[in-house]
């Protein structure tokens, strides 16, 4: 029998303490110097949203150039087992995946192996959807949502659980007719990005999932991410919920999409932070350049008109925040909602993930608030407060009940118990009292609807 000495015991104990300390440190990341108050304001805002909207888990990361300024999880990764969410909780990040697919194509473009403006048949000879127009479909169009292809592939899409291959998904698109002439209009298309990813699979004779792991995720250093679930991913994947207007809550389905390149990335916010660091280092990763600076600049430049703060670049949605160009993408897939934003000029970024279906209005609001705080902090300004709401006074709520018409918008306001509901032909959302008046405030919509009073008249405003 091996003798276990007191010295061995203390060595063993030291190792355990060290490992446990590392584990605790890796779960959440404390704010760096100067970001302490920013983190406190965000903690308050996130806890408010979780409590008021009955959410499972939210994780957020802030990026300041090549540093994680703060990262933390809130709520429960697994509510039944009471496992708390943290910064390394894994989420399905939906359409944020598109940015990675497009970057993989751009790696090959800068090597001269792919031309974005060649007809797609140059690379996929059998991909011939019905195109009654003279303008051919190209990769550039598909990556900036200007191809005219239908939004969803006929198979392997968000609404089917067939779990077919990427090849079969792309083949299902071929019998379809273009919705618009290529380049004429912006039409968001998951089908198009499925074709983009399939192009990589065909040209380089490697399954898309393996290709992306080697050429994108590993090069960025996203060691806790993947385009298909594995044991490591599943062990940290948040338990996600679906919900309905009649208050039913049920577990989100876990089937894989056939259109993998458009929405199948699994990642924690700490790995999304590494992606944003690539954007701020002009394409340089931990093992060299993932993408060249000039190629990255093309990705964040407007395609087919528009400006640096409007429309799409290659993959990236372009907008404005605080006078700066803001780039990013949202993501929505069964049970999960994500928002990623970056401001390249000042190298600030944020990613927010939620494990409740169609809660994108919340991840978007929180992400924009995070950027507001970071900008105010940078400029030594007073940090703004988060917009919070409360139930509408019962007497006022009763006076709001009725049918509203504004242009093509038809809506009803109903009082249900203590809650005031706005019901349109496409959504139902609570109306609540804020400091600036009555606004929509629910999982599905935040502030897009307002009630304005002019004299004795009430009007419904849709922003």
Predicted features, each with a name:
Residues 1-9:
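Bacterial N-terminal signal peptides that target proteins for export
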Residues 10, 97-101, 138, 192-195, ...:
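Catalytic-loop motifs flanking and including active-site residues across diverse enzymes
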Residues 10-20:
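Bacterial N-terminal signal peptides
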Residues 22-72, 201-206, 210-214, 218, ...:
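Catalytic loop of the DD-peptidase/beta-lactamase superfamily, centered on the K-T-G motif
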Residues 29, 47, 76-190, 197, ...:
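Active-site-proximal loop and beta-strand segments within enzyme catalytic domains
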Residues 61-62, 154-159, 184-186, 228-231, ...:
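Short coil/turn segments at secondary-structure boundaries
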């Amino acid at each position: 029998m091996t003798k276990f000495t007191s010295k061995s015991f203390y060595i063993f104990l030291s190792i355990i303490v060290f490992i446990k300390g590392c584990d605790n440190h890796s779960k959440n990341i404390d704010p760096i110097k100067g970001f302490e108050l920013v983190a406190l304001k965000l903690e308050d805002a996130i806890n408010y949203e979780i409590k008021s909207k009955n959410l499972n888990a939210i994780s957020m990361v802030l990026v300041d150039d090549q540093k994680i300024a703060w990262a933390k999880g809130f709520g429960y990764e697994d509510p039944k087992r009471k496992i708390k969410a943290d910064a390394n909780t894994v989420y399905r990040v939906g359409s944020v995946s598109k940015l990675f697919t497009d970057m993989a194509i751009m790696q090959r473009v800068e090597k001269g192996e792919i031309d974005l403006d060649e007809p797609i048949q140059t690379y996929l000879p059998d991909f011939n959807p019905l195109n009654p127009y003279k303008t051919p479909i190209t990769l550039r169009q598909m990556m900036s949502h200007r191809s005219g292809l239908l939004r969803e592939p006929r198979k392997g899409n968000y609404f089917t659980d067939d779990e077919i291959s990427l090849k079969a998904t792309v083949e299902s698109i071929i019998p379809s007719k273009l919705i618009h002439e290529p380049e004429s209009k912006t039409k968001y298309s998951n089908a198009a990005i499925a074709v983009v990813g399939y192009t990589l699979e065909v040209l380089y004779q490697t399954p898309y999932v393996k290709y992306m792991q080697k050429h994108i995720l590993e090069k960025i250093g996203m060691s806790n991410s993947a385009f298909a679930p594995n044991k490591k991913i599943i062990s940290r994947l948040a338990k996600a919920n679906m919900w309905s207007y009649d208050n039913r809550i049920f577990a989100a389905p876990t089937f894989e999409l056939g259109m993998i390149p458009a929405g199948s990335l699994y990642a924690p916010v700490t790995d999304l932070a590494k992606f944003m660091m690539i954007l701020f280092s002009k394409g340089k990763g931990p093992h060299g350049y993932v993408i060249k600076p000039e190629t990255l600049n093309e990705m964040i430049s407007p395609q087919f008109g528009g400006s640096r703060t409007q429309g799409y670049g290659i993959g990236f949605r372009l907008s404005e925040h605080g006078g700066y160009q803001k780039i990013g993408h949202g993501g929505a897939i069964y049970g999960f909602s994500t928002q990623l934003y970056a401001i390249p000029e000042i190298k600030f970024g944020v990613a927010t993930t939620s494990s409740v279906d169609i809660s994108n209005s919340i991840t978007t609001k929180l992400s924009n608030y995070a950027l507001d705080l970071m900008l105010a902090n940078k400029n030594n300004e007073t940090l703004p407060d988060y917009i919070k709401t409360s139930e509408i006074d019962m007497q006022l709520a009763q006076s709001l009940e009725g049918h509203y018409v504004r242009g093509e918008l038809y809506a009803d306001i109903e009082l249900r118990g203590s809650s005031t509901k706005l019901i349109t032909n496409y959504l139902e959302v609570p109306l609540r009292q804020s400091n600036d008046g009555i606004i929509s405030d629910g999982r599905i919509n935040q502030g897009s609807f307002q009630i304005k009073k002019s004299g004795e008249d009430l009007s419904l405003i849709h922003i």
